[in-house]
Amino acid sequence: MTRDEVNTVLGSLKTDVKRTAKSPQGFDVIAFRAGGNDTDKSFDEKYSTYILIYLKDDIVVGISGNASSMNFDGTVSYGTDAGTLVSNGWVDVDWYKTTAGNAAAYSKDVDNATIIAFADAYGDDKVYSIQIFNNAYSIADMTKCRETTLPMNYSADVLTEMETETFEILNAYLVNTGVRAVDDKALRKNTKVSNVARAYSKEIADEGCIDAANAERKLALSKEALENAGLSFNNWGERIMIGNMDAIGFANSVIESERSRDTLISTDYVFCGIGASVYTESAGKAVYYPNMVIDFVDRVSAL
């Protein structure tokens, strides 16, 4: 499918948040919520769908979907049980697991595409998100944790897009799973809080640490701080910090961290902000780290 064909289809879906941006990997990304401009839809209904379409040379090469209606050629759909995937020949994604070492995503090659289905490992263990890429582009190469010497000085526009997309993906998860016991399942994005998140992201990057409770923590302890926050640094959790990742990778990693997930679904939170920065560990090793302000309650309470 070409870019023009995509735009023709989107024009009939009352989409909002439709925009084109560059991903960190250099793809053109069209992001949208189907029905987002439909005045008959409720707040939650508008946030129940979020789709990212990846293009290279104006040709669609991949798609990430978070929606209760998503389905890929009858092979996998929203709500498919992880056990069913395994029975049908899907394999664990070895670089994407929970802190307990349990599978949180499954992969299968179909025709000329690689599909990754993300399952809610800390919930009902059913599929809530699907990512598909042409085999010419490796999803693992885009998201698997690895050292890199690629420039990570992303523009402010790219960082803003990453923040927005992460927020949208998390909201689609919250609405479709119904894990929040409140009338509105989706969180509201607060500009003031987002500004704090962005500033705090920069502070963390400048201090060379990750821990929200103590921005002065030395780098040698930052890995321990990640693990204490419920993130497995040696497996999927490290993807939160790698520079060569996409928004869906970060959002799903938040979901698969038990502590972050519990914070995310808490009924105490009705809004959130997301910040992003470039964090450099040492010469030749640049990593990308976005963070959610709902994990940093000490900062929010001061507003």
Give the role of each language-model region:
Residues D157-A225, V270-C272:
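Short, well-ordered surface patches within globular domains
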Residues D16, W95, A199-A213, N234, ...:
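Secretory-pathway/luminal and periplasmic proteins that interact with or process carbohydrate-rich
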Residues A117-A186, S301-L303:
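Intrinsically disordered, low-complexity
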Residues N7, V86, N171, R198-A205, ...:
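Non-transmembrane alpha-helical segments in soluble domains
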Residues V17, N71-V76, I139-T143:
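A short, polar/proline- and glycine-enriched secondary-structure boundary/capping micro-motif
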Residues A67-V76, L150-E161, G178-N190, D206-D211, ...:
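Second-shell loop/turn segments in exported
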Residues T2-D57, T80-I132, T267-A283:
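A cross-family detector of function-defining hotspots
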Residues L55-D57, G62-T114, A220-A302:
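A well-ordered secondary-structure block
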